[in-house]
């Protein structure tokens, strides 16, 4: 159910874009993201940091898009989110000396420190590449291509990278954890 809720604003954004335009889609995205946040609080009595950060960025960049009637703001949101994710991953590893991925998954998985570091850097690089790809597609290609890339391309890339990360983790698990 939670995974469905995470993707609901994206589905709403896409549907409103196809039915109306980028501004209706942006309005719908803001509302849908707020509803998901409220639902999460009511249902689970918890709001994840990433969900809250995403909502704030959706509200700010979406609000600027609507206020100035300029779709460039909502296009930048994707890159800003990915830059923040990459920055958090890199800072956790280089400044805090413990990769964020390890902080998130370390209780469930026993992996060598080197593997955690490589996985953390791989995700940071993934977010940087996706952010740069978003800039190129958002500002050099037609809007409808950017919307499709945002909805389907980035979702597919994230799913594929998650699966590849799972394979990488599995290869480095101690034998007793693989069963």
From Swiss-Prot:
Main location (coarse class): membrane
Topology in the lipid bilayer: Multi-pass membrane protein
Any single GO CC term annotated in Swiss-Prot or TrEMBL for this entry: plasma membrane
Entry's localization field: Cell inner membrane
One of the Pfam families matching this protein, by short name: IspA
Transmembrane segments: 22-42, 50-70, 76-96, 121-141, 149-169
Record keywords, A-Z: Cell inner membrane, Cell membrane, Membrane, Transmembrane, Transmembrane helix
Function: Plays a role in cell envelope biogenesis, maintenance of cell envelope integrity and membrane homeostasis.
Alphabetized HAMAP family for the sequence: YciB
Family: Belongs to the YciB family.
Name of the molecule in the record: Inner membrane-spanning protein YciB
Gene: yciB
């Amino acid at each position: 159910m939670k995974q469905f809720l995470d993707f609901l604003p994206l589905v709403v954004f896409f549907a409103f874009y196809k039915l109306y335009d980028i501004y209706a889609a942006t309005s719908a995205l803001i509302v849908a993201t707020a509803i998901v946040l409220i639902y999460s609080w009511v249902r689970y009595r918890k709001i994840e940091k990433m969900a809250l950060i995403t909502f704030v960025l959706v509200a700010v960049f979406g609000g600027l898009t609507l206020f100035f009637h300029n779709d460039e703001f909502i296009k930048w949101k994707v890159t800003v989110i990915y830059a923040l994710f990459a920055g958090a991953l890199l800072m956790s590893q280089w400044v805090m000396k413990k990769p964020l991925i390890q902080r998130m998954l370390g209780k469930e998985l026993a992996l060598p420190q080197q593997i955690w570091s490589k996985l953390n850097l791989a995700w940071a690089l993934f977010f940087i590449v996706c952010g740069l790809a978003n800039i190129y597609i958002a500002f050099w290609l037609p809007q409808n291509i950017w919307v499709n890339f945002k909805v389907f391309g980035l979702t597919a890339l994230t799913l594929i990278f998650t699966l590849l990360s799972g394979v990488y983790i599995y290869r480095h698990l101690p034998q007793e954890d693989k069963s």
